Amino acid sequence: MFFLFYTKITHLVNLYYLFYVKDCWHSGNFVIFASRTSKRNIMKVGDRMPEVLGLNEKGEEVTMAQFKGRKVIVYAYPKDNTSGCTAEACSLKEHYADLQAAGYDVVGVSKDSAASHQKFIEKYDLPFPLIADTEKALLQSLDAWGEKTMCGKKVMGTLRTTFLVDENGVVEKIFSPKEIKTKIHAEQILEAIK
């Protein structure tokens, strides 16, 4: 038997949670199983990028104010040193001068630690900062954290997403996970900003 009830949890991001409660009898004991699913915020074109992006690989706070007068590419990726994420980062590195010439700075974000980011940057000589969003606050506010399928199983994780943000901090374009081709992602961006 399933019972469905809603509970509003108010904290920093005012997320809503939906709890499913199932009763079952096991050895004469009542057991409750609960799973939490957040009601996702949907970041869309025309929305403002959060002012504080988080801490970079050096532990320094990164804010949108630091990019005033410049456009920013904020790209969310699942994990340092994995094949797709490395291909995407290297694509952005290889075309970094072209992106800069077009008026864009680049910032990556994943749930990896600052130490992991530092090693990733050093290993591939990445010229842009990476946000260590270990608490997933930025990823959730960007709607870049959610359920996805990996190896046939449903898991929670980072949804590879890229945001093109104008000089005023407003999202101009969003590349969804299905649109991103990691090996040529910088070329996709350059084509979109022509």
Regions of interest found by a model, annotated:
Residues F5, V13-F19, P50, K93, ...:
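Compositionally biased amphipathic helical and low-complexity segments enriched in hydrophobic
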Residues W25-H26, T86:
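Secreted/luminal cysteine- and crosslink-motif detector
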Residues I32-K194:
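Chalcogenol-based redox active-site neighborhoods
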